[in-house]
């Protein structure tokens, strides 16, 4: 009985250790998308630059991204904020941490104490993602072009079902032994990806998203030509196990980073 109990406890310890190890390696990303008017932009940007991002860094979040649309949407002005979290616990606790930070509250006073008659923004949309194990951490792009000229391509692949979404993710991250995966092809051609991830909470699911980055529009076009003409992609896209309409909607959003963006 003692031996059996010892073995059971040992097995549980191994399982718990494995679970902790996996969780420790997984990064979660939040996109906060501000819907706001042009007149509201200065207040939100000052809050992000002077209060929010410094407070996040004090809380252990090393890099935060802030992006705008290259071609503004005149009907729905947006500002994108990208925050990587080391765990779901860190994500869950962040608002409490900020609320206890007096320096944050002073620096963000105009934004935080805005009246309903003079709002700081229209609304905030939130997307929560889990990093793929093939790229468990975000990467700061290794680009040398001016930030205002860069093209950050945010892609969203929606699937018609959870099963087909899993198939698309497998094509994206595993592929096959001979040709590799989509992610491998991106890496081969140096697409300077910030992240690859699965949406775990948002208005568009099931869904995978990723962000690749380029010095400018010509650089973007040249990289995609390499990808589309890659012989491994020619095979991978036609494999029967990855057929069957795994993507029902492919959205592309073209962004550029603001000067105070870490990404």
Task: Pin down the residues of each PLM region.
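Bacterial Sec-dependent N-terminal signal peptides
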Residues: 1-26
């Amino acid at each position: 009985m003692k031996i059996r109990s010892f073995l059971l406890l040992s097995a549980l310890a191994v399982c718990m250790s494995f679970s902790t190890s996996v969780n420790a390696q997984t990064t979660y990303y939040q996109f906060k998308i501000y819907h706001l008017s042009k007149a509201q932009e200065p207040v939100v940007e000052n809050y992000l630059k002077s209060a929010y991002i410094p407070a996040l860094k004090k809380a252990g979040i090393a890099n935060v991204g802030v992006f705008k649309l290259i071609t503004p949407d005149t009907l729905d002005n947006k500002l994108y904020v990208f925050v990587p979290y080391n765990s779901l616990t860190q994500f869950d606790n962040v608002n409490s941490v900020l609320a206890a930070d007096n320096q944050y509250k002073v620096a963000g006073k105009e934004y935080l104490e805005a009246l309903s008659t003079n709002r700081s923004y229209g609304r905030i949309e939130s997307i929560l993602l889990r990093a793929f194990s093939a790229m468990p951490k975000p990467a700061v792009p290794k680009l040398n072009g001016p930030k205002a000229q860069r093209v950050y391509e945010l892609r969203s692949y929606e699937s018609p079902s959870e099963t087909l979404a899993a198939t698309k993710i497998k094509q994206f991250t595993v592929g096959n032994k001979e040709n590799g995966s989509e992610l491998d092809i991106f890496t081969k051609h140096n697409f300077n990806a910030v992240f690859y991830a699965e949406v775990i909470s948002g208005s568009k699911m099931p869904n995978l998203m990723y962000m690749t980055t380029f010095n400018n529009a010509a650089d973007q076009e040249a990289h995609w030509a390499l990808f589309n003409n890659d012989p491994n992609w020619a095979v991978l896209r036609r494999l029967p196990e990855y057929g069957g309409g795994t993507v029902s909607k492919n959205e592309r959003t073209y962004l550029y980073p603001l000067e105070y963006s870490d990404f």
